[in-house]
Amino acid sequence: MEYDDVKVKLSEIEELLNTLGKKHPKEISAFSRFLREVAETKALTTREKELIALALGISAGCEWCIYLHTQKALEAGATKEELIEAGLVAVLMAGGPALMHLIPLMKAIEAFEKEHGES
């Protein structure tokens, strides 16, 4: 998967939130406030929270969540090995279906590495 394909998935999240924000401003505003509050660094670092969110996204089978939280975890300093290990924890907890959702994780890692000139 190319980085442009991942960017399309990420832009779909933004489009959804913008569309819903116009039709359901109270709900999306409340969700955004909750998101900011939870994202604030307290006992867990941003990196740790993003790795948890990634594992939960894999367990839930949410491809958009996988791309978003892979990106955010990398931005927070997570390594490729940490991303894969978080994915394996998801598989441990959610079984075979979660294993199949390591496919988008691996594609996201590859796409972000290509974008940043890593391999």
Q: Model-derived features: where do they sit?
A:
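Acidic, glycine/proline-rich low-complexity segments that act as flexible tails and inter-domain linkers
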Residues: 1-48, 101-119
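Short cysteine clusters
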Residues: 62-65
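Charge-rich, acidic-biased intrinsically disordered regions
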Residues: 77-88, 113-119
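Residue-level detector of well-ordered alpha-helical segments, enriched
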Residues: 47-51, 82
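Iron-sulfur (Fe-S) cluster-binding segments and ferredoxin-like electron-carrier domains
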Residues: 68-80, 106
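Short alpha-helical scaffolding segments that buttress acidic/His motifs in well-ordered protein cores
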Residues: 31-35, 51-58, 86-93
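Short, conserved micro-motifs enriched in small and acidic residues
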Residues: 46, 56, 60, 96
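C-terminal structural segments of small proteins and small subunits
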Residues: 84-108
